[in-house]
């Protein structure tokens, strides 16, 4: 490993040296050109200019040679990666590890997921990537050629995007590898890692990652399969356990929190305002109905979404107000729920101060319940005497109430998670041997075709009917298949037998050596070459 690292360092040095030499020569050439342009025609000057051009050409040739040499060094250093396969990793933070103030800086809007994936996969040691960004979490899933280098590149990307120093980010990030990363995603999809244990909306968000990745072509085979298996795990947990029964969602917890903060005698008469008619907003309306609320004002950019909610939910009066009337609507509300995709606050301290006071019957305080990330309501609004702000981090108070029962159900769900994890790991293990299987079949078929041609030439074309020729070809194919059956059986790693991955990989290495297939190094070299060439363009 040390030798390989040295090789890579030497390669980097070759690049740097070539660039330095090329830069110096180019600068010299430019100076000569300026002298010549100035009208000095002495032979000495002309000779020096010619010499400068020649030196520049030589420097370019040296730089090109250095690039080739560096690429060869990178090829040699492929041994660094051959000791272990590419790693699946998740790097992220959630409501459990970081405050909303940090999460909102890292939040990636759904329409920007494809661009984020493109930026991540352009990093030198990242092959595949996916982004899961919700109000409670921001997680990046990658397949990394090198664990340490890949993690460092992703953390640097997150730091650059958010403006948060990498050292500060690391205090709140969690990093999981391979089966731990996969299990985490399966638990997320099943609602086991949610602030609200068992909530259902996260499964829809995991599905959206797959749809978004497929539409943009950004998901590789490992990440794509992992997310699809996570969806399967999430569905099974909800169908085969009762974890979702009675489980609250972020939206229902927001409604519950608001009612907890209102005087009990005035809960049903409180004037409710919802800003944002998206998925979360729709769920707020649904849970207001469940609590007996008869009227809600909904502010939204367009009326179509509000009409759709009104059409679906007949048990409540829904009044539409356009976005331009948001502050007027807030002035008439006792409770303001916010759930929009705005990246800047809709309500600041100045806005809250301008709103009229609330009646003493309602506690004299206007409640802002903000379930958006980034936040729609500035924290400083709470500094206003007649206003209180609650965000998603404040929902824990509600969640704790019925947590024990769902924790027991979560234990049942872990059995399903483990089953789905084993299926995914078996599938991924099987990928290790696919290149060897293909190479071995191709190698055997080339020999078969060559020997068959020699045989047919000896017999003579005229001596064979079409049926006889076809029979001979089928015979040769059958012999090859019979001979390959045993070796290929020992390359199986799909979880259907007791053979371990180490045993299978040992068989694969043996076949690579015996038949000079050399598939591993060729694949790694190809990946590294593509990365190097991409970085040079």
Curated annotation (Swiss-Prot):
Reaction equation(s) it catalyzes: (S)-4-amino-5-oxopentanoate + tRNA(Glu) + NADP(+) = L-glutamyl-tRNA(Glu) + NADPH + H(+)
GO biological-process terms attached to the record: chlorophyll biosynthetic process; protoporphyrinogen IX biosynthetic process
InterPro entries found in the cross-reference section: 4pyrrol_synth_GluRdtase, 4pyrrol_synth_GluRdtase_dimer, 4pyrrol_synth_GluRdtase_N, GluRdtase_CS, GluRdtase_dimer_dom_sf, GluRdtase_N_sf, NAD(P)-bd_dom_sf, Shikm_DH/Glu-tRNA_Rdtase
Stored Gene3D superfamilies: Glutamyl-tRNA reductase, N-terminal domain, NAD(P)-binding Rossmann-like Domain
Catalytic residues in the record: 135
Pathway terms, separated by semicolons: Porphyrin-containing compound metabolism; protoporphyrin-IX biosynthesis; 5-aminolevulinate from L-glutamyl-tRNA(Glu): step 1/2
Keyword NADP: yes
Location of the transit peptide in the chain: 1-48
Top enzyme class: oxidoreductase
Listed name of the protein: Glutamyl-tRNA reductase, chloroplastic
Keywords: Chlorophyll biosynthesis, Chloroplast, NADP, Oxidoreductase, Plastid, Porphyrin biosynthesis, Transit peptide
A Pfam family of this chain: GlutR_dimer
Function in brief: Catalyzes the NADPH-dependent reduction of glutamyl-tRNA(Glu) to glutamate 1-semialdehyde (GSA).
E.C. numbers: 1.2.1.70
Keyword Transport attributed: no
